[in-house]
């Protein structure tokens, strides 16, 4: 009986943990356009983003990753956000 109870507890913990990871967003974390690096976002980060900005001498540069809300674009920084896995 103790073994059955212990087994049920372990199965419950594993299932709950899998449920939490199923709701986790994955975003591309690479700053190189031709390379994708998958990164698991934190629970409060529900968006993937790409920020593009101009750097004198280098041209347009991008930074990608996870974020909790999408900032507004400015003339010098352009943001794109989306809410599905590896969407940017």
Curated annotation (Swiss-Prot):
Pfam families recorded: Toxin_cobra-type
CDD domains: TFP_snake_toxin
Disulfide bonds, paired cysteine numbers: 27-48, 41-66, 70-81, 82-87
UniProt keyword list: Acetylcholine receptor inhibiting toxin, Disulfide bond, Neurotoxin, Postsynaptic neurotoxin, Secreted, Signal, Toxin
Purpose of the protein: Binds with low affinity to muscular (alpha-1-beta-1-delta-epsilon/CHRNA1-CHRNB1-CHRND-CHRNE) and very low affinity to neuronal (alpha-7/CHRNA7) nicotinic acetylcholine receptor (nAChR).
SUPFAM superfamilies per UniProt: Snake toxin-like
Species in which this protein is naturally found: Micrurus corallinus (Brazilian coral snake)
Keyword Lipoprotein set for record: no
Main location, first listed in the record: secreted
Tissue expression: Expressed by the venom gland.
PROSITE patterns per record: SNAKE_TOXIN
Signal peptide: 1-21
One CC-aspect GO term: extracellular region
Name assigned to this protein: Three-finger toxin 3FTx-2
Family recorded in the similarity comment: Belongs to the three-finger toxin family. Ancestral subfamily. Orphan group II sub-subfamily.
Compartments where located: Secreted
Record has Nucleotidyltransferase as a keyword: no
One Gene Ontology MF term: acetylcholine receptor inhibitor activity
Transmembrane segments: none
